[in-house]
Amino acid sequence: MLRKTLSFISVLLLAATAAGAQNPDDGTARPRSVGVVMSGGGAKGLYHIGVLEALEENGVPIDYVAGTSMGSIIAAMYAAGYSPAQMREIVASGVVKEWVSGRIDPRYTPYYRQIGHNPSFISVRLNLGSSGKRFRVTNLISSTPIEMALTELFAAAGGDFDRLMVPFLCVSSDMNAREPVVMRNGDLCEAVRSSMSIPLVFKPMKVDSMLLYDGGIYDNFPWRPLDVGFRPDLI
């Protein structure tokens, strides 16, 4: 209860700050841009839906969004036009569990090779640079269901950053360069999928010459990329 109360107070203070900003030229109130950052954290990332709901209820405009891992999915959905209520409905339907189960909907199995329900392993060779060392990476869950889900979720946006209603970016981790990678253009589904490539759970995404894993490895709370990329007044 205390945490909820403090969160509500923070929202009210943010709303007051955003609404009460003064224009230095004539003293009138001017709108201030707000950027919202959504961290990773597995199922805990779904709490971001409540934060978005609280901000909207208190009249706080959301001009930019950024996210990592599960936070990237919620941020991208908001950017694509999903309301917090619609997100809650999707979560309540239980489909999120299906996304991460690795099980393919029987309706779609004719289009994919049959994948058993037991954990299956694939290996990739990961070049770590000048050291020449390589190690074996495995994934426990098929990424097919989540990839199909992302394609459906962002179909209206054509899978394109430029067609989003709210500017969005997400962060992945380049394991070759050992650094975070900011993604704010190109294939939206690919970007979100790479941002949530949890090691040993989902296979990494290969984008150009990069092997991308979950963004939380190097930047679980990407406030700096949002600040540099969009320059909002408030984060």
Where are these regions (language model features)?
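Patatin-like phospholipase
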Residues: 2, 20-68, 76-235
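Bacterial N-terminal signal peptides
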Residues: 7-16
